[in-house]
Amino acid sequence: MMDEPWWEGRVASDVHCTLREKELKLPTFRAHSPLLKSRRFFVDILTLLSSHCQLCPAARHLAVYLLDHFMDRYNVTTSKQLYTVAVSCLLLANGVSLLSPRLKCSGMISAHCNLHLPGSSNSPASAPHPPPTPPQVAETTGKFEDREDHVPKLEQINSTRILSSQNFTLTKKELLSTELLLLEAFSWNLCLPTPAHFLDYYLLASVSQKDHHCHTWPTTCPRKTKECLKEYAHYFLEVTLQDHIFYKFQPSVVAAACVGASRICLQLSPYWTRDLQRISSYSLEHLSTCIEILLVVYDNVLKDAVAVKSQALAMVPGTPPTPTQVLFQPPAYPALGQPATTLAQFQTPVQDLCLAYRDSLQAHRSGSLLSGSTGSSLHTPYQPLQPLDMCPVPVPASLSMHMAIAAEPRHCLATTYGSSYFSGSHMFPTGCFDR
């Protein structure tokens, strides 16, 4: 069927190989934007808009990718410009996400296709003239018209409370000019793989009959376990939008790490199966750093949930204190041989899982993960929407990690983790959460 998800089709492995080839050609994210500190706010805007319009995760992740890399190349200096670019990225990304299922193979879309997006003001009469459209793309564009009801209209976007509360209204003329600018900035190639494009394919092998829970007994119901793991994986997938540090990894690595982190949280053994290694071509060692970052965020949210519950109960008079309940009980692990000062930091089930997970790695990892930060020289006035200079960004000598998660209900934690949380060789700088 034409609407069959690609990961369930007969050419799933071929599509996966094509996506893996395309991700190798993705540009490097330099974190040079002078408005990088506003990134999380606009990611939240895109998330809420996509949820309001019921867009798929692939559209949301592609929209954030387009916004990040456009900000990385151009001096978007005003909030009006950033709102306009964000909405345009969402509409363009949704158009591409609707085209992809019709082609059944993401690699079939030409890098120079003339996109005519229903619901937007992009039209062939006013658009620049790219190279000729391949026959399969032209055929698909015609079939795309009957899905116009799935594309949010500009009036629908403007009427949302998210934008109206900011006194923001986007005109068709502004949308047209911004769409054309985005298409030219990406050389008319919007078919870019994101972690959302890989996740469902890896979820096919996420649970098996051979899995054990808590290292002791087999899972009694693989179907329910897989459903629960899918919820975890999609949660971790949304977590990756919150920080540009995940651009340090290839999209397929991030997607596989979401599955790996989910298996760790559900205490499925082994943490990474042979089927997952075969389908993704990644070993646990390849995913270790990315998984650790995701587990730190997960631990943050657990602590926040316990704190919120305690505060709510404290406001009710006559309510006796209740013991803290966790989603699962930590299994009994053998001694890990860690220093006492390091073990003292691990007091929650998730932290115990992190230790056990780290101990399960066979090869010692070397090197550290460094994320770019904006220097003071990048905060000088700029001309609107001009390409950024290719200047190096200084990295501070002492770095720490500030993680915060926005969700509904919104959690606004800002917890500092030193490099000793997992090992002395990893430091995760993330400065984009400063409001």
Curated annotation (Swiss-Prot):
Signal peptide: none annotated. The keyword Transmembrane does not apply. The keyword Repeat does not apply. The lineage of its organism: Eukaryota, Metazoa, Chordata, Craniata, Vertebrata. This is Cyclin-J-like protein. Belongs to the cyclin family. Cyclin J subfamily. Residues 120-142 are annotated as: Disordered. SUPFAM superfamilies: Cyclin-like. InterPro entries: Cyclin, Cyclin-like_dom, Cyclin-like_sf, Cyclin_C-dom, Cyclin_N. Keywords: Cyclin. One of its GO terms (cellular component) is microtubule organizing center. One of its GO terms (molecular function) is cyclin-dependent protein serine/threonine kinase regulator activity. GO terms for biological process: G1/S transition of mitotic cell cycle. Residues 14-191 form the Cyclin N-terminal domain. SMART domains: CYCLIN (SM00385), Cyclin_C (SM01332). PANTHER family: CYCLINS. Pfam families: Cyclin_C (PF02984), Cyclin_N (PF00134).
